[in-house]
UniProtKB/Swiss-Prot annotation:
This protein's name: Ribosomal RNA large subunit methyltransferase H
Protein's gene: rlmH
EC category: transferase
Keywords on record: Cytoplasm, Methyltransferase, rRNA processing, S-adenosyl-L-methionine, Transferase
Keyword Cytoplasm carried by entry: yes
Amino acid sequence: MKIKLVTVGKLKEKYLIQGINEYLKRLNSYAKMEIIEVPDEKAPEKLSDAEMLQVKEKEGQRILGKINDNEYVFVLAINGKQLSSEEFSKEIEQLGISGKSNLTFVIGGSLGLSDSVLQRSNQQISFGRLTYPHQLMRLVLVEQIYRGFRIMKGEPYHK
């Protein structure tokens, strides 16, 4: 299985990079995973609704440029479906069984995702109604993907 994570912005925090790299190393025995960072759109602190929409659209076009037609796309969205770790694992397993072996996960920028990215997605998922820094969500998502494979293979993992 090939897994791609498309994110907006460059990760700068060393502790997050180290955590992500640790889980990527652990994931190697289950799946090939790559992380693609697209540039975030520079914008002033205060934006009008039209300017926010424009920023999301520009970032959205960059995201869509990294997604292929044959990929099953999950986007992280606050209003997405909430899954337990076991349900998430089952979802990935079922996709693999049905022949969908190219999975892409998308984490938007600080303003969220454009409508065009949401429309391209096959599934919107959420890690709850709380708001998290999008950089931190990279680590959380990669850990959950790793956890999902451990669960799928019947291997022990902390609950």
